[in-house]
């Protein structure tokens, strides 16, 4: 199928989701305008075989694997007592690995920068207005971007979701959070 799109597809958000969408579309020849500020990317990711298949479809599996640590198992311990609770052993035939979010972002940015049909604008969007023909995005500097298609990749508290759902307030904060951490094996 031939790409007949002439105006760029705007992607709001420059995190992992936004960059991945930009690479997928850009690799297919679509013009893409990626708008937003690069986010802070603390922490890490555990990648499963499905995750590596997704990265492979973007041409990034080898680049990510070069920066990742292969996992043979995941050990779950009680944080307060260091008591061993359980262990999940991974089948060696199926790749599991841990990698920092920043390393994933660096690989995504490097790949996106090789695609000439992807344009970056480093700005913060203040308003998203959905119209019948086009969407209008207004930056904090007053710049206006209009597009036939907008992909919202600015997170669950982002403007794209608020524009679609009509919710302008923040969602309630959960009482508990699940977290993953690395702790020295000697502790």
Label for each model-derived stretch:
Residues 13-16, 37:
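Glycine-rich Rossmann-fold phosphate-binding loop(s) that bind the pyrophosphate
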Residues 26-43:
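Glycine-rich FAD pyrophosphate-binding loop
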Residues 16-17, 28:
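Mobile amphipathic helical/loop "lid" adjacent to a hydrophobic cofactor/ligand pocket
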Residues 14, 44, 101:
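Charged, low-complexity surface patches
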Residues 2-9, 24, 48-165, 169-186:
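Conserved N-terminal helical subregion
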Residues 17, 40, 157:
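Conserved Rossmann-like nucleotide-cofactor binding loop
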Residues 9-11, 32:
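Conserved hydrophobic helix-helix packing surfaces used for dimerization/oligomerization
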């Amino acid at each position: 199928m031939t790409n007949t799109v002439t105006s760029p597809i705007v992607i709001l958000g420059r995190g992992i989701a936004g960059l991945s969408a930009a690479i997928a579309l850009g690799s297919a020849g679509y013009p893409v305008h990626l708008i937003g500020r690069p986010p802070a990317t603390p922490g890490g990711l555990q990648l499963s075989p499905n995750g590596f298949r997704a990265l492979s479809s973007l041409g990034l599996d080898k680049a990510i694997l070069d920066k990742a640590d292969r996992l043979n198992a995941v050990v779950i311990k009680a944080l307060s007592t260091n008591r061993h609770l359980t262990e999940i052993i991974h089948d060696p035939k199926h790749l599991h690995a841990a990698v920092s979010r920043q390393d994933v972002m660096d690989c995504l940015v490097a790949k996106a920068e090789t695609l000439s049909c992807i344009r970056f604008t480093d700005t913060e969007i203040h308003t998203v207005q959905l119209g019948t023909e086009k969407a209008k995005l207004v930056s904090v500097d007053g710049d206006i971007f209009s597009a036939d298609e907008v992909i919202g990749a600015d997170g669950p508290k982002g403007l794209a979701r608020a524009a679609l759902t009509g919710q302008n307030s923040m969602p309630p904060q959960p009482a508990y959070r699940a977290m993953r951490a690395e702790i020295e094996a000697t502790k």
